[in-house]
Regions:
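GST-like domain detector, emphasizing the conserved glutathione-binding G-site
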Residues: 1-127
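Amphipathic alpha-helical packing segments from all-alpha helical-bundle domains
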Residues: 127-133
Length: 133
């Protein structure tokens, strides 16, 4: 059975849970509490050196990054399809997904926000300012 290491408030992990459930794939959810720093503990880092969620374990292999995991799920369980079959339509969907994961998500990511307000000593308005530019 697949094992999904995730955090309930992680939008990246949520994307993978949606894909797994839409495809009807059974999986075991292994919570990783990001607020308590469980992703930084040796036990988790030994499995996933990135220390991020989600991570999907399948037959001893560890997959990371939500869009890569979703692409894997689409390949091994093509029905029902999550992505259009037409290459141009598929490219448009991927462009939208990449906009969310690369442009929007980082500005709302807890790890990024802590870094901005911690080591960089930026105020809480910094993400809003960055989003407008």
């Amino acid at each position: 059975m697949m094992r999904l290491f995730d955090y309930h408030r992680s939008s990246a992990a949520y994307r993978v849970r949606i894909a797994l459930n839409l495809k009807g794939i059974a999986y075991e959810s292994i919570p990783v509490n990001l607020l308590e720093g469980e992703q930084k503990e040796e036990e988790y880092r030994s499995r996933n050196p990135q220390g991020l969620v989600p991570m999907l374990e399948v037959d001893g292999r560890r997959l990371t990054q939500s869009l890569a995991i979703i692409d894997y799920l689409e390949s091994v369980a093509p029905e029902p399809p999550l992505l259009p079959r037409d290459p141009a339509d598929r490219a448009q969907v991927l462009a939208l997904a990449l906009t969310v994961t690369c442009d929007i998500h980082p500005l709302n990511n807890l790890r990024v926000l802590k870094y901005l307000s911690g080591p960089l000593e930026l105020d809480q308005a910094a993400p809003s300012i960055a989003a407008r530019n």
